[in-house]
C-alpha cells in the first residue's frame, strides 16, 4: 500500500502527487482509496471517548456516519475482520438523512442529529462490538449546533428550532430516553443561545447551575 500526498488537482480524473515510497509498479491503477477526513472531504463534527474507544461523528461528506477506534488504541481505525475489539464504522440509516451534531458518552453513547436523538444500547452481556452495535431513535426534536451539557443526571441540549432546552434522560420504567423541556418556566430568558455550560455542586455549594449564553451577550441561569 502506498500513500500519495496530493499536490495539484488537474481534472476529475487527473491529479499530481508525491508517493511516500517509490512504487514498484507504475502502471495505471483503477482501485484506490481516499482518507475519510481531509480538507476536501471535511473533518469530524464531534468527538468523544466511550468504552475505551475514540468516537468521531459526522463530516461534510459523511454527515450520518460514526467512526469508532479499536478498543484501547485511539488512533487505530482498521476494521480488520470484525473482531470484537476492532474498529466500528457505521452509517445511521433512517428515512431521511440527518447530520450528526454531537456524540456524548453518558449512560450510553448518545447521538444528537439534526432530526432526532438516538443512543447505542449496551449492557454487561452485550458490549459494544462490530457485530452487536445498533442505533435506536428515541425522540425527534433535532439538535442545534450547540454542544449538549452533562447536567443533573441528564444530557441537556438545545433543540433544532432553538425554541427550547431539553434534557435527554433515561427512564428505568420505560427503558427508553425522554426529552422533557426544562425551559418552559423561563422561556423569556432564552434568546439565541450560542453556548451552554454547567457549574457542578461543590463542598461549600449544594446547588448546580446551567448557564446559557445568548448571542447578545446576555446569560440565563437555570
Predicted regions and their residues:
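Short solvent-exposed strand/turn elements
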Residues: 12-31
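Beta-propeller and closely related beta-pinwheel folds
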Residues: 26-206, 222
Amino acid at each position: 500500500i502506498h500513500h500519495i500526498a496530493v499536490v495539484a488537482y488537474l481534472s476529475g480524473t487527473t491529479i499530481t502527487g508525491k508517493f511516500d515510497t517509490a512504487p514498484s509498479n507504475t502502471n495505471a491503477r483503477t482501485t484506490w482509496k481516499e482518507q475519510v477526513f481531509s480538507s476536501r472531504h471535511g473533518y469530524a463534527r464531534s468527538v468523544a471517548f466511550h468504552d475505551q474507544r475514540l468516537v468521531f461523528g459526522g463530516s461534510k461528506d459523511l454527515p450520518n456516519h460514526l467512526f469508532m477506534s479499536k478498543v484501547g488504541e485511539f488512533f487505530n481505525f482498521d476494521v480488520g475482520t470484525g473482531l470484537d475489539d476492532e474498529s466500528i464504522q457505521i452509517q445511521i440509516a433512517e428515512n431521511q438523512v440527518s447530520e450528526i451534531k454531537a456524540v456524548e458518552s453518558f449512560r450510553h453513547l448518545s447521538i444528537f442529529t439534526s432530526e432526532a436523538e438516538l443512543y447505542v444500547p449496551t449492557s454487561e452481556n452485550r458490549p459494544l462490538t462490530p457485530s452487536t452495535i445498533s442505533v435506536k431513535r428515541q425522540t425527534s426534536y433535532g439538535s442545534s449546533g450547540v454542544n449538549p451539557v452533562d447536567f443533573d443526571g441528564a444530557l441537556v441540549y438545545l433543540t433544532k428550532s432553538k425554541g427550547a432546552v431539553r434534557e435527554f434522560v433515561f427512564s428505568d420504567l420505560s427503558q427508553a430516553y425522554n426529552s422533557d423541556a426544562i425551559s418552559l418556566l423561563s422561556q423569556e430568558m432564552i434568546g439565541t443561545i450560542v453556548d451552554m455550560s454547567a457549574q457542578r455542586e461543590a463542598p461549600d455549594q449544594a446547588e448546580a447551575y446551567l448557564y446559557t449564553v445568548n448571542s447578545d451577550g446576555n446569560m440565563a441561569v437555570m
